[in-house]
A protein has these predicted regions:
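N-terminal "mature-domain start" segment
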Residues: 21-62
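Sec-dependent N-terminal signal peptides
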Residues: 4-14
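C-terminal segment of classical bacterial N-terminal signal peptides
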Residues: 14-20
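Short, well-structured beta-strand
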Residues: 135-208
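Conserved polar/disulfide-associated segments of primarily extracytoplasmic proteins
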Residues: 67-153
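Stable alpha-helical elements in mature extracytoplasmic
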Residues: 44, 94-101, 191-194, 198
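Second-shell loop/turn segments in exported
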Residues: 30, 83-93, 181-188
Length: 208
């Protein structure tokens, strides 16, 4: 009985959190090791993609070798978008917004607002539901994607990133959520086990 009561209270706390304004929502995104590091930014990101059509917040968690081109976990990371109800996060919308995000990031980091992005490309494909999903996620949808862009931090060369994307909602919430696992390594490599485990541990912190 006690466990049941605690579970009900926890679910109620999550529902209250999900109903809060996006800027007030907080998330648990588990770190595989203490060396993983992250940040939180507002969407759209005014510094590099002000034209992004999604409004809310982004939580990012980077692998230790994120910005070190000689490391096996180079440019490997996860991020979470908590955004308004519109536009709906369909494959078409995700493709458009990912292009805006990464093209803007390249231009800003390279200091070239007129950067030629004609060779940039984003593909998004719906998939069967992934086995692991964030806790309390409802109406989840799964996608894979690739992003071809100029990696602007370390190599400044063309790079192909592989993605797993999952969208979902929470009970009694008007908002949408997106979790992305990203790496230049193909999805059958060991690093993806780590990324998927992170996704399975994501949770909206309940209101206390």
């Amino acid at each position: 009985m006690k466990k049941t009561i605690l579970l009900v209270l926890a679910l109620a706390g999550v529902s209250l959190s999900a109903a809060q304004p996006l800027a007030q929502q907080q998330f648990d995104i588990p770190k595989p090791t203490p060396k993983w590091f992250g940040e939180r930014i507002a969407l759209p990101p005014k510094g590099f993609a002000p034209d992004l059509g999604l409004k809310g917040i982004e939580e990012i968690l980077f692998a230790p070798g994120m910005f070190k081109a000689d490391q096996p976990d180079f440019f490997t990371y996860v991020f979470l978008f908590a955004v308004e109800a519109k536009p709906e996060l369909t494959a078409k919308v995700l493709q458009k917004e990912l292009f805006t995000y990464y093209a803007g990031l390249s231009k800003a980091r390279l200091g070239n607002p007129k950067l030629d992005t004609s060779e940039f490309a984003v593909t998004v494909k719906p998939m069967k539901p992934f086995e692991l999903k964030p806790k309390e996620a409802l109406e989840s949808k799964s996608f894979t994607a690739t992003v071809k862009w100029i990696e602007p931090f370390a190599t400044r060369k063309m790079q192909t990133l592989h993605f797993e994307l999952q969208t979902w909602k929470y009970a009694k919430s008007p908002h949408q959520y997106l979790f992305v696992c990203a790496s230049p390594q193909p999805r059958d490599k060991d690093i993806w086990k780590t990324l998927r485990k992170i996704r399975g541990g994501v949770a909206l912190k309940p209101v206390k």
